[in-house]
Swiss-Prot record:
Transmembrane segments: none
Subcellular location: Cell inner membrane; Cytoplasm
Name of the featured protein: Protein translocase subunit SecA
SUPFAM superfamilies named among the record's database cross-references: Helical scaffold and wing domains of SecA, P-loop containing nucleoside triphosphate hydrolases, Pre-protein crosslinking domain of SecA
Gene of this entry: secA
Keywords (A to Z) from UniProt: ATP-binding, Cell inner membrane, Cell membrane, Cytoplasm, Membrane, Metal-binding, Nucleotide-binding, Protein transport, Translocase, Translocation, Transport, Zinc
GO molecular function annotations of the record: ATP binding; metal ion binding; protein-exporting ATPase activity
Membrane topology: Peripheral membrane protein
Record CDD domains: DEXDc_SecA (cd17928), SF2_C_secA (cd18803)
Species for this entry: Solidesulfovibrio magneticus (strain ATCC 700980 / DSM 13731 / RS-1) (Desulfovibrio magneticus)
Catalytic activity annotation: ATP + H2O + cellular proteinSide 1 = ADP + phosphate + cellular proteinSide 2
Function recorded in the entry: Part of the Sec protein translocase complex. Interacts with the SecYEG preprotein conducting channel. Has a central role in coupling the hydrolysis of ATP to the transfer of proteins into and across the cell membrane, serving as an ATP-driven molecular motor driving the stepwise translocation of polypeptide chains across the membrane.
Enzyme class: translocase
GO aspect biological process, one term: protein targeting
Record's subunit section: Monomer and homodimer. Part of the essential Sec protein translocation apparatus which comprises SecA, SecYEG and auxiliary proteins SecDF-YajC and YidC.
Length: 838
């Protein structure tokens, strides 16, 4: 009640924000006559002066009105387009690090030029992030005319560029590219060995186009760079052949909402019988158990032509949000291999994670982040909670006149599609263009076959023919055109109405199913009614649609039966629409929780990643890597002799033997310790340090590179093993809940212990190698050139788990584990016989 009164008196937060921008808009408009009077050269010269002023410390906010006025005039002269006042509002919103929600056709591409030019004045780089290579190249070429007119340089990051081309693109004032390319470049940079090989500058300011798609839809998809692990392709084929023997509900259960599969007791017994093993859950059989579950997922959760397609003997992932094919991307954790075995194509070798990051953590590294989209308001809470981004709805330049008709609900898929085909035929007869949105390739092809039978000419736009995407979308608004599009394929290309279409009612949007997110439905609707054009939309649903089936259609079915509805007769009322919206809200909340969980777990990894990556940068950029070597040697010697400093009386001979063995193992120095006192400690330190000095004299100028090589090589090898250990920990952490422990807290605690172990292991391995290296006086620098880790790797999408690795990394003995205690890895062996074995 109080909220409603306050809203009436003061207006909404959005309205107050927009009102507060009026003085700035007036200031920009006041500059216009002055800027219009400048020649092209004078305008360029003024931009150069502004750059100098900003470099000398003048805040960007001070130069905003003049810069925006310059960009507006430059746009008129170079592109023939003038920014409306509402577009200036969008530009200010983006500059202030917020999300600008702008309806389709309101010129988001042009709006971005305002904050891009303003922030480019700092010389620190501006990244404009799009959803695909086509849009990155198109926008860079199109808006590049404006930037070039003002004397600013533009680069484009697309798939297939080499490091030199990437360095040039990142060195430009403004860089366009896709979220994947930016993220993978960050990971690749943190696998490089020399500073001059780095391609990215520090992350300054990013504008994310279609921000909802990138920061929300793809947030569950970590970026993963992986290399090949040991081959187990024959095992996939063997397990795949056993799957038909298992019966659903009897041998296994499927949870479609959570997309998980579980074996029942009967299923476990059946598998043990056919695999000729005693216990499927024995640690020795963990790989077999994993293969069985992945094969079940491949057969019973992942559907051909919905989740993936088979093309040229390869399983290619279909992006669930855009319907586009994603060649080169592979499911990790052996799921892709299970799908290959299912489809009887060649099974490729499995992968091991080399580097990974989520989009959530990558984008939060930017000093300033903002975004644009046509639909963000439904996820405003998530943007605020996870990214600290406020969503501002920008008013349209002309009022929206599109008519959104209520949903029609049918009993079955058959009735629904027959009604759709009949309505499309009627609309086509009238000449009104129709855009039909489907949720999968399978459904788009089913509808296409039905329309062929009724003689309606049409275009199909799905992952199988996205090469013609822009061309098909550009013509979709012409009279008589019928276009079937999978999901939101074709976003970013405006559908312009052809001659005479306005009189026919504009573009009609026909949705064949509600998406689990209201935002995706709104995106489909938003293709019609751009810039004040007429248009209409309607969704057709069936009680056996996935959303309805999984999230409560029983009450509706009962209602339809009570009403005694005939076959083919739809129901259309508010209660139905409300029930559907509630189902969508439940799914959205469920997905938000999943993304939040992912972030909570990844935050643990992120803190560790930041420490390791900043250490790498420090080593790469250091002129004196030998100082790290000296520090490490001193730390190791201190730790080995620490137990003796606290002792009163004679030390235990066994303890002295252990210490001497450690000195020989890590420092390659033989000594018989008498008492472990300060004198012996200094003797060891002097001997080991002296040998490093000799090494430095022999190697001369190359010693620094040798030291850097061993330090970085050790860091990279152990970081890879640590990623694997963290994956294993993550997979099993859910079981801690059965022991009345919070899995998240346990993951943090155990993850920290593993990380401490990693730090020790990296240090010890580097010094162990450096203590044994022998360098000839005529050493060649390339002998210590590090092989390029990024040469033969794969870039992949969602990492559901990482059970695929076979090798548990060797860990330093932790003080909390006794040598006769059970090993913490879960093998059931004593620690001294397992990971405590030297």
């Amino acid at each position: 009640m109080l909220k409603a009164i306050a809203h009436k008196v003061f207006g909404s937060r959005n309205e107050r924000y927009l009102k507060g921008l009026r003085p700035l808009i007036e200031a920009i408009n006041a500059f216009e006559p002055q800027i219009q009077a400048l020649s092209d050269d004078a305008m360029r010269a003024r931009v150069a002066e502004l750059r100098q002023e900003v470099a000398e410390g003048r805040p960007l906010d001070d130069v905003l009105p003049e810069t925006f006025a310059i960009v507006r005039e430059a746009s008129v002269r170079s592109l023939g387009m003038r920014h409306y006042d509402v577009q200036l509002i969008g530009g200010i919103t983006l500059h202030q690090g917020k999300i600008a929600e702008m309806k389709t056709g309101e010129g988001k591409t042009l709006v971005a030029t305002l904050p891009v030019v303003l922030n480019a004045l700092s010389g620190k780089g501006v990244h404009l992030i799009t959803v695909n290579d086509y849009l990155a190249k198109r926008d860079a070429a199109w808006m590049g005319k404006l930037y070039g007119f003002l004397g600013l340089s533009v680069g484009v990051i697309v798939h297939g560029l080499d490091d030199q081309q990437r360095q040039a693109a990142y060195g430009a004032d403004i860089t366009y590219g896709t979220n994947n390319e930016f993220g993978f470049d960050y990971l690749r940079d943190n696998m490089k060995f020399y500073q001059e090989q780095l391609v990215q500058r520090p992350l300054n300011f990013a504008i994310v186009d279609e921000v909802d798609s990138i920061l929300i839809d793809e947030a569950r998809t970590p970026l993963i760079i992986s290399g090949q692990a040991e081959d187990s392709s024959t095992l996939y084929a063997r397990v795949n052949a056993l799957i038909p023997m298992l019966r659903r509900e009897t041998h296994f259960t499927v949870d479609e909402k959570a997309r998980t599969v579980l074996l029942t007791d009967e299923g476990v017994a059946r598998m043990e019988d056919v695999l000729k093993i005693d216990n499927l859950f024995d640690p020795a059989n963990i790989t077999l158990q994993h293969h069985v579950l992945q094969a079940l997922k491949a057969h019973h959760i992942f559907q051909r032509d919905v989740d993936y397609v088979v093309k040229d003997g390869q399983v290619i992932i279909v992006d669930e949000f855009t319907g586009r094919l994603m060649p080169g991307r592979r499911y990790s954790d052996g799921l892709h291999q299970a799908l290959e075995a299912k489809e009887l194509v060649q099974v490729e070798a499995e992968n091991q994670t080399l580097a990974t990051i989520t989009f959530q953590n990558y984008f939060r590294m930017y000093k300033k982040l903002s975004g644009m989209t046509g639909t963000a308001d439904t996820e405003a809470v998530e943007f605020r909670e996870i990214y600290g981004l406020e969503v501002i709805s920008i008013p349209t330049n002309k009022p929206m006149v599109r008519k959104d008709f209520p949903d029609l609900v049918y009993k079955t898929q058959r009735e629904k599609f027959e009604a759709i085909a009949a309505d499309v035929k009627d609309l086509h007869k009238r000449g009104q263009p129709v855009l039909v949105g489907t949720v999968s390739i399978e459904k788009s092809e089913l509808l296409s076959d039905m329309l062929k039978k009724t003689g309606v000419p049409h275009d199909v736009l799905n992952a199988k023919n996205h090469e013609k995407e822009a061309e098909i979308v550009a013509l979709a608004g012409h009279a008589g055109k019928v276009t079937i599009a999978t999901n939101m394929a074709g976003r970013g290309t405006d559908i312009v109405l052809g001659p005479g279409v306005t009189d026919l009612g504009g573009l009609h949007i026909l949705g064949t199913e509600r998406h689990e997110s209201r935002r995706i439905d709104n995106q489909l609707r938003g293709r019609s009614g751009r810039q004040g054009d007429p248009g209409s939309s309607r969704f057709y649903l069936a009680l056996d649609d996935d959303l309805m089936r999984l999230f409560g259609s029983d009450r509706l079915k009962g209602l339809m039966d009570k009403l005694g509805m005939e076959d083919g007769e739809p129901i259309e009322n508010r209660m139905v629409s409300r029930a559907i919206e509630n189902a969508q809200k439940r799914v959205e909340a469920h997905n938000f929780e999943i993304r939040k969980q992912l972030l909570d777990y990844d935050n643990v990894m992120n803190q560790q990643r930041e420490v390791i990556y900043s250490r790498r940068r420090e080593l790469m950029g250091s002129d004196e890597p030998e100082t790290f070597v000296q520090e490490h040697i001193e730390e190791i010697v201190d730790e080995i002799f620490a137990p003796f400093a606290a002792l009163k009386g004679e030390p235990d001979p066994e303890l002295l033997e252990v210490a001497a063995a450690q000195i020989e193992d890590i420092l390659d120095y033989k000594i018989e310790l008498a008492d472990g006192g300060e004198a012996e400690k200094q003797a060891v330190l002097e001997a080991v340090t002296g040998r490093q000095r000799e090494l430095a004299e022999t190697a001369g100028a190359h010693y620094k590179e040798v030291a850097r090589y061993f330090l970085l090589d050790s860091l990279d090898r152990h970081w890879k093993e640590h990623l694997l250990s963290m994956d294993h920990l993550r997979d099993g952490i859910g079981l801690r809940g059965y022991g009345q422990k919070d899995p998240k807290q346990e993951y943090k605690r155990e993850g920290f212990e593993l990380f401490q172990q990693l730090i020790y292991n990296m240090r010890d391995a580097a010094i162990r190698a450096l203590s044994r290296v022998r360098i000839r006086a005529e050493v060649q620098e390339q002998e210590f050139q590090h092989k390029d880790e990024t040469a033969n790797v794969q870039y992949s999408g969602p990492a559901e788990s990482a059970e695929d690795a076979k090798k548990e990394p060797k860990r330093r003995e932790a003080p909390k584990v006794g040598r006769n205690d059970p090993c913490p890895c879960g093998s059931g062996k004593k620690y001294k016989k397992c990971h405590g074995a030297k």
